[in-house]
């Protein structure tokens, strides 16, 4: 793998319904085998269900859910003199968003409702209210970083 050039970030077009780039990223993460229309149906369907349940702006609730799931600090492995330490480091903003999206989708897929639309809408509402599996994942990551605070001077 060449270290000469850093890959440049691709520009992502906003989604057609809400005009939001983050929703497009979320759709792309949900998509399997390039089936964008299926992913669109799932995301838009889930946001419609959320709007029906909570009676608030679904895009605002979606962003609130992402913010509640995004980690501020995480641990990374660092080898020092034969020992491997879990060193807490701050999470870059782009990685925060990517992790939040990934954890939300994984949590939604792990739920036991029948349709993905229902699972995703349920997880979004839970995450917006600081409940659910995705928020628990963030809490676990933060707890791990807190437990390893003693090694924070190994930061690089």
Curated annotation (Swiss-Prot):
Ordered alphabetically, the record's keywords are: Ribonucleoprotein, Ribosomal protein, RNA-binding, rRNA-binding, tRNA-binding
What InterPro entries does this protein's entry cite? Ribosomal_uS7, Ribosomal_uS7_bac/org-type, Ribosomal_uS7_CS, Ribosomal_uS7_dom, Ribosomal_uS7_dom_sf
Q: Where are the transmembrane segments?
A: none
Does the entry annotate any disulfide bonds, and if so which pairs? none
Instruction: Please give one Pfam family short name.
Output: Ribosomal_S7
Q: Does the keyword field hold Transferase? A: no
Q: Which GO terms describe its molecular function?
A: rRNA binding; structural constituent of ribosome; tRNA binding
* Domain of life of the organism encoding this protein: Bacteria
User: PROSITE patterns this protein is in?
Assistant: RIBOSOMAL_S7
GO cellular component assignments:
small ribosomal subunit
For biological process, the GO terms are: translation
Q: What does this protein do?
A: One of the primary rRNA binding proteins, it binds directly to 16S rRNA where it nucleates assembly of the head domain of the 30S subunit. Is located at the subunit interface close to the decoding center, probably blocks exit of the E-site tRNA.
Q: How does it assemble?
A: Part of the 30S ribosomal subunit. Contacts proteins S9 and S11.
Query: Would you identify the family this protein belongs to, as annotated?
Result: Belongs to the universal ribosomal protein uS7 family.
Q: Which PANTHER family does the record cross-reference, listed alphabetically?
A: RIBOSOMAL PROTEIN S7
> Do you know which HAMAP family this protein is assigned to?
Ribosomal_uS7_B (MF_00480_B)
Protein name per its UniProtKB record:
Small ribosomal subunit protein uS7A/uS7B
- What species was this sequence derived from? Bartonella bacilliformis (strain ATCC 35685 / KC583 / Herrer 020/F12,63)
């Amino acid at each position: 793998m060449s270290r000469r050039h850093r890959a440049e970030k691709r520009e992502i077009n906003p989604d057609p319904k809400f005009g939001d780039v983050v929703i497009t990223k979320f759709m792309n993460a949900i998509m399997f085998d390039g089936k964008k229309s299926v992913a669109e149906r799932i995301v838009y369907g889930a946001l419609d269900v959320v709007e029906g349940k909570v009676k608030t702006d679904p895009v605002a609730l979606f962003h609130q859910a992402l913010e509640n799931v995004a980690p501020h600090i995480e641990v990374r492995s660092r080898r020092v003199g034969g020992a491997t330490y879990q060193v807490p480091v701050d999470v870059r903003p782009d990685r925060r968003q990517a992790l939040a999206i990934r954890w939300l989708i994984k949590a939604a897929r792990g739920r036991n409702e029948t349709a993905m639309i229902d699972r995703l809408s349920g997880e979004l509402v839970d995450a917006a209210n600081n409940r659910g599996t995705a928020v628990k994942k963030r809490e676990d990551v933060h707890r791990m970083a807190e437990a390893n605070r003693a090694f924070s001077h190994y930061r690089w």
